């Protein structure tokens, strides 16, 4: 993030706030991919202006807590401020499965495959579903993936903290952000 961008963000935010006041916009949220620090900066800016938005969309997945974490650093603040939380990048565009678009594999290199390490798709999605989220955004590009995700959600049972911690312990070797190509140092 760039603090100089505040000058660009404030007029845009003000325009949306005005439209919300006029009834043309119902809810306003924010999102970002690169750094939890940008989210915390946005929340601080809003607080300094005495404002709150309704939602925040951010990357949340089973490797996130090991590196520059949105879950560890931003989620508690969002919960305290009663935001609707939208989890994205739950499978890191397929990279947790050793897949993803060819151009991404070329530009960011290969990654591990958590399925080959004994994880199930229900572990990966279930971990995020067990966090205090309002919605899980899953990129589905085939009907088969929609059906598979639907089955996982239908059969979902929330994980205990111990179950989540056990899964996290198994992904510790993926710390450092290699799988999470979108994270940038700021």
Model regions: which residues?
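Beta/alpha (TIM)-barrel catalytic core signal, keyed to glycine-rich beta->alpha loops juxtaposed to Asp/Glu
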Residues: 1-186
């Amino acid at each position: 993030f760039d603090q100089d961008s505040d000058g660009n963000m404030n007029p845009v935010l003000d325009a949306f706030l005005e439209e919300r006041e006029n009834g043309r916009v119902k809810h306003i949220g924010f999102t970002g991919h690169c750094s939890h620090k940008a989210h915390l900066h946005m929340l601080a800016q809003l607080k300094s202006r005495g404002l709150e938005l309704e939602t925040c969309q951010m990357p949340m997945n089973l490797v996130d807590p090991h590196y520059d974490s949105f879950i560890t650093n931003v989620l508690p603040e969002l919960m305290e401020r009663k935001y609707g939380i939208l989890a994205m990048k739950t499978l890191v565009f397929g990279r947790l499965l050793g897949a993803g678009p060819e151009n991404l594999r070329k530009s960011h290199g290969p990654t591990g495959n958590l399925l080959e390490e004994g994880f199930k798709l229900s572990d990966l999605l279930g971990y995020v579903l067990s966090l205090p989220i309002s919605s899980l955004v899953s990129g589905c590009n085939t009907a088969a993936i929609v059906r598979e995700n639907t089955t996982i959600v239908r059969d979902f049972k929330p994980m205990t903290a111990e179950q989540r911690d056990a899964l996290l312990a198994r992904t510790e070797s993926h710390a450092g952000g290699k799988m999470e190509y979108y994270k940038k140092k700021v």
